[in-house]
């Protein structure tokens, strides 16, 4: 589980001096302007320029002089159990207001151990509401032995004034709390880190607008030969475009310029690429009067219904992600076989005649690819189909599907999109999901 999902609702800013009152070590909040390239975060004591912001339980972090990797003192993290009213997980970020020049280092390293086998999320670059150069490793395995963790920095030349030094996040194991210890947190230059690459990524393009890439998956080869997987900001890289007249990229924003065709973005500082497979038109703008519509997903109407848009039902392989192309929102379904779109609250369709949905097939096809669209009343064992239609899809073109609803339709609980036997495509785009009456 990715515990940072809870940061926005559990973030608690702590006055550092009072927070550590009575602890063995204190963080000095005076900014150390004379050492902008300081490598230490925690080496028996906190670096003098650091401040701390707790996530989850505010009192989860302290220091310990008994259990340590080396020296005299370690950081002690008390991970609470899920029922702790003060906070049901432990996390925090160490930062400096002045920023540090980290361009001479290529890794953040630390040692960690735990009272129980668990996993930890950790990284750097978490500062403020809009981190610029974040790097995260999830699923770090922790046990009763001290183990060194290496968090590679994909392109440290960008970090000339970085403020986010180190963050961690951990949750309960088997509904129980436990203790973590972290020690020797510092930035290093490790000469045997090599072969930085981004995971190849494909996406749809649109005639105009900006598309923001929030994160990339990357890999860096560690001294032990393992390719360490990291989640990182695209801003670490400078990308070149194979067709700049069609699309360009600046930091983490792709801008489309109106042309059509394939575009490949390659980073100068790493291997791998981001490929825009084609430029697609936007879905047709709906023309129904809003008074006759109950909308789930459309930029034309007020969406009074809501859904996570993927029920992750048994045996499905379908993933989903939303594309925001200059304010136009489109849902992408990949590795598609079928997907359930379960409504957060049932839709009263007693006065509605049709379910509408626009679908675009991204795969090349022989012209014989179909999709089944269904509306269901009830769920689980009590599900009943109240509307169904099989439609032939067209590569690169939007197909509008209008599914007649049964005359006795009352509350619609879920929708289902399914690839019938004989069809073999993988990727579709979906827009304008709503119910309407004539």
Residue ranges and their predicted role:
Residues 129-161, 378-412:
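Extracellular carbohydrate recognition and processing domains
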Residues 110, 148-188, 357, 370-373, ...:
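Extracellular beta-strand ligand-recognition surfaces/modules
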Residues 86-108, 141-143, 344-355, 392-395:
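Extracellular/lumenal carbohydrate-interaction signature centered on repeated Trp-anchored short motifs
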Residues 86-90, 117-127, 164, 365-376:
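Beta-strand acidic-aromatic groove motif in beta-rich domains, primarily in extracellular
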Residues 63-87, 316-340:
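Short carbohydrate-recognition loop motifs
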Residues 16-53, 189, 193-198, 279-287:
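Bacterial Sec-dependent N-terminal signal peptides
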Residues 229-253:
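Low-complexity "stalk/linker" and mucin-like segments enriched in Ser/Thr/Pro/Ala/Gly
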Residues 194-238:
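Solvent-exposed, low-complexity, repeat-rich "mucin-like" stalks and linkers
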């Amino acid at each position: 589980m990715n515990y940072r999902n809870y940061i926005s609702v559990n973030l608690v800013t702590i006055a550092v001096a009072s927070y550590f009152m009575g602890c063995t070590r204190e963080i000095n909040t005076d900014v150390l302007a004379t050492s902008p390239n300081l490598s230490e975060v925690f080496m028996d004591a906190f670096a003098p320029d650091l401040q701390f912001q707790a996530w989850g339980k505010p009192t989860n972090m302290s220091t310990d002089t008994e259990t340590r990797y080396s020296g005299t003192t370690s950081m002690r993290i008390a991970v609470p159990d899920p029922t702790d009213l003060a906070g049901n997980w432990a996390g925090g970020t160490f930062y400096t207001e002045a920023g540090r020049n980290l361009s001479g280092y290529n890794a953040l390293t630390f040692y960690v151990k735990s009272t129980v086998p668990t996993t930890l999320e950790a990284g750097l670059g978490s500062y403020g509401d809009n981190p610029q150069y974040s790097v995260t490793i999830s699923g770090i395995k922790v046990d009763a032995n001290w183990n060194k963790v290496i968090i590679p920095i994909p392109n440290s030349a960008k970090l000339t004034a970085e403020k986010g030094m180190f963050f961690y996040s951990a949750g309960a194991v088997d509904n129980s709390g436990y203790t973590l210890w972290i020690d020797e947190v510092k930035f290093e230059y490790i000469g045997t880190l090599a072969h930085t690459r981004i995971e190849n990524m494909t996406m749809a393009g649109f005639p105009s607008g900006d598309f923001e890439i929030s994160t990339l998956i990357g890999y860096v080869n560690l001294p032990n030969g393992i390719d360490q997987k990291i989640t990182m900001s695209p801003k670490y890289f400078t990308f070149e475009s194979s067709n700049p007249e069609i699309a360009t990229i600046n930091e983490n924003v792709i801008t489309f310029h109106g042309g059509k065709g394939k575009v490949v973005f390659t980073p100068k500082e790493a291997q791998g690429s981001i490929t825009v497979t084609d430029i697609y038109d936007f879905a047709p703008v709906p023309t129904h009067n809003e008074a006759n519509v109950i909308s789930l997903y459309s930029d034309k109407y007020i969406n009074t219904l809501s859904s996570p848009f993927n029920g992750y039902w048994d045996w499905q392989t379908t993933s989903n992600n939303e594309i925001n192309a200059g304010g136009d929102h489109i849902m992408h379904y990949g590795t598609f076989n079928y997907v359930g779109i379960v409504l957060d609250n049932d839709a009263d369709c007693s006065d509605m005649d049709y379910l509408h949905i626009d679908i675009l097939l991204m795969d090349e096809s022989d012209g014989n690819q179909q999709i089944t669209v269904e509306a269901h009343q009830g769920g689980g064992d009590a599900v009943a189909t109240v509307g169904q239609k099989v439609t032939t899809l067209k590569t690169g073109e939007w197909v509008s599907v209008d599914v007649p609803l049964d005359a006795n339709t009352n509350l619609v609980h879920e929708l289902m999109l399914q690839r019938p036997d004989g069809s073999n495509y993988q990727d579709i785009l979906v827009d304008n999901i709503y119910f309407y009456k004539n």
